[in-house]
Amino acid sequence: MSATTKTKRWISPEEYLEMELHSEVRHEYFAGEIFPMGSETVAMAGASVEHNRIAGNIFSELHAHLRGKRCEAFMNDMKTHIHDQGDDWFYYPDVMVNCNPAGQQKYFCETPSVIVEVLSPATEATDRREKRLAYEMIPALHTYILVAQDRREITIFRRAPERWLREELPDDGEVLRVPELDFSLSLDVIYARTGL
């Protein structure tokens, strides 16, 4: 008995975008391959109530703060596109801010300046490693924020001239600040209605 191997077909970014328009399950794209978001269970079942509340709290405050300004906040159905050395990635951040209208397409953004990911057990490792490294390739990005959903803890990566700086906000009295947007948000508001 011989083992059979499946050959994965390379999918172009254009094919992926067209497939995603008609898919019942959201997928992320990496260099010609597509992957269900987090896992098939997460992609089909969706995120937890806490995840949605946290992302919604952050989005609603950003959206209100940016009203009438050149920057705009988007929620989890808007993809971000990364292109580097001939490879393409498409991810669905939980929240992102774009300040460059030229980088905004109908279904994705190429120039986010802020990206927020709310961590879940199924996605935390990917958000902390793979996505962080990919997002750091976006020239316009200056702030990448990771928000725990099971404890009051926020990790912020900020672009500095030669590297990225990491900052932790583990305390109740802390405030998340994004100076480039003249925006600040307390952990109490971020974690409102979560019981944390």
Which ranges hold each PLM region?
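Gly/Pro/Ser/Thr-rich low-complexity, intrinsically disordered segments predominantly at protein N-termini
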Residues: 1-196
